[in-house]
Amino acid sequence: MTFLILTILATVTPSLYSHVVQRELRVNFEPLAGQRDSWPVARAAMVTFDARSEKAREFSECRMINSMHELSRELMDSPEHTVKRASKEEMDDLVQRCSGSAEGRSWFIWPDTKWCGPGTDAKNESDLGPLEADKCCRTHDHCDYIGAGETKYGLTNKSFFTKLNCKCEAAFDQCLKESIDRAEGSAKSSMEGLHSFYFNTYSPECYEVKCSRKRDAECTNGIAIWKDSYKS
């Protein structure tokens, strides 16, 4: 009897572990031409595959994300370790494989905001969306920056993305966290997703300005250095 049980286990066990289904949200970020804020344009796809297979990149599910609302929901529902950055080339390939089209949609402003994304949907400076985080994004959009290809504080931005002063990123982080603490329900969840999208998924570099003269309150001769994040 013992031999029979062991034989059954030996037969069944490999089949139980032969397939390890993994689900990932792939996100690509690209700059918006002429932008002055630090938000990227996003494209995203949800893929499912067998992680143990030699052909792990043959997807059992391959679905393009069709709106910023959908992207925000997927980001909130996906464990952080399953959200992966994708290069432009990788995303172009996913677009072709998932939709059969050579073009994929890009998404911009976060749901229920007018300032949280590249550019703005606001009609004027006072125009805000219902999400409290929009106030944080508006302030963030008007912060000290170095545009793509520009030089400031003796530092040249050689990337295609606008980079902000690390003080701006720190203030934005704090503002979002305070807004999240005051919120409830779906608004709280949405702002948590927004915070994770910007600081964890996108994770922008920033620059720290050091004044050459300690008594120079306006730091007119400041020199900047790049930082991986405002926390580094």
From Swiss-Prot:
Where expressed (tissues)? Expressed by the venom gland.
Catalytic reaction list: a 1,2-diacyl-sn-glycero-3-phosphocholine + H2O = a 1-acyl-sn-glycero-3-phosphocholine + a fatty acid + H(+)
Instruction: Provide the E.C. number(s) assigned to this enzyme.
Output: 3.1.1.4
Show the propeptide residue ranges: 19-105, 214-217
Q: Does the keyword Lipid metabolism apply?
A: yes
Print the keywords alphabetically.
Calcium, Cleavage on pair of basic residues, Disulfide bond, Glycoprotein, Hydrolase, Lipid degradation, Lipid metabolism, Metal-binding, Secreted, Signal, Zymogen
Please list the cofactors this protein needs: Ca(2+)
Residue positions binding Ca(2+): W115, G117, G119, D141
Q: What is its main location?
A: secreted
Question: What superkingdom heads the lineage?
Answer: Eukaryota
Q: Where in the cell is it found?
A: Secreted
Q: A GO biological process this protein is involved in?
A: arachidonate secretion
A GO cellular component annotation here is: extracellular region
Q: Which residues form the signal peptide?
A: 1-18
Q: Report the active site residues.
A: H140
As for family, the record states: Belongs to the phospholipase A2 family. Group III subfamily.
What task does this protein carry out? Scorpion venom phospholipase A2 (PLA2) that shows high hydrolytic activities towards lecithin and acts as an effective blocker of all angiogenesis key steps in vivo and in vitro. It has no effect on apoptosis and does not display hemolytic, inflammatory or neurotoxic effects. PLA2 catalyzes the calcium-dependent hydrolysis of the 2-acyl groups in 3-sn-phosphoglycerides.
Protein name in the entry: Phospholipase A2 hemilipin
